[in-house]
Amino acid sequence: MVSALSFCDLKGSSDQGQAQHMEDEATVPIYERHAEALYQNVVEGSFQEPHFSGLEVQPPANPQNILSRYQFGRILGQGGFGTVYEGRRLEDGLEVAVKIARKPWNMPYIVIPGHPALLPLEVGLLILVNWDPKVPQIVQLLDWQDQPDYYIMVLERPSPCTDLSNYISLFRGTLHEFVARLVMWQVTHAANVCSARGVLHRDIKMENLLINPETLEIKLIDFGCGDLLKESAYNQFCGTEDYCPPEFRTEGRYHGNPATVWSLGVLLFRMVCGHFPEPIELLAIYTGIWNQSGLSHECCHLIQCLLQQDPSRRIGLEEILPHSWFQVLSLRSATNGLEEVFTF
């Protein structure tokens, strides 16, 4: 899946190929050329995105087409179902990211309160998680449009930022426990908000977390693997293999929130240990004897609570933030010197 918003290294299965037929560039508006180039070879499964060079490209005004409201810059990332572009809103100069995604033949649609028409699943999920009160830890959907063969999403583009994977690489692949706790609090809060609003992200990982390197503020992005949260089990896995819950491997099914808890455990382990958990480490965690030199007892205990192989023994999603590791957490803004203290 293509990331809903990736500013650094968008992951996804590449489906590139030389476009076989394009309209004459001198006569066709840029947004129409883009749509044609992106979707003309859907049947053949081969397409190539046109590359816009710089923000000087300005599509003609057209109130019927959302793309006419923005200038386009470089490609931020692309994958099997579309491309994310750097953009700027013509109305006020706001920097945005524009995702243009082609629709698969079995495109899922949903209906949500306040929107009687069918919505593309990813659009609907983002609308749900962006209900008021909005939370800064989840990327905001600013605008969207549904077309017969593709849908378009305009999302906020914070600056400065990088994805968490790139950020961790600056520190030899491991974060200090205090920094990891700041990150973990924000990601867990975002996951709780998603759950409370009926959304299952299903792909919480470092590449889908944007971090401001100055303030350490986090944003959860890319709901392309998401689904509506339900009480019954899911029998199809959509996400990243390294974060796949063990119950899906053994039973072919999983429940939403316990799977989210597992992915949060993998994320925390990866941040503070520098690698994904090995089978022997998971066995030690399951038996309660795992420990990591240099980490606090509370951090090790939380990891053991998160990475229980049996989902019935796993900590509940709503129980993570009250854990003793988060009893007092200070989040300092490097830009304005303000300090916000979270106590649980």
At which residue positions do the language-model features occur?
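Juxta-kinase regulatory segment immediately upstream of eukaryotic protein kinase catalytic domains
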Residues: V2-N65, G73
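Conserved N-lobe ATP-binding subsite of Hanks-type protein kinase domains
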Residues: T83
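Short beta-strand micro-motifs within the conserved protein kinase catalytic domain, predominantly
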Residues: Q140-Y151
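Structural motif in protein kinase domains
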Residues: P158-I168
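Activation segment signature within eukaryotic-like protein kinase domains
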Residues: V183-M184
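Catalytic-loop of the protein kinase fold
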Residues: S195-N212
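Conserved end of the kinase activation segment
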Residues: E247-P258
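Terminal C-lobe "cap" of eukaryotic-type protein kinase domains
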Residues: Q309-R313, L317-S333
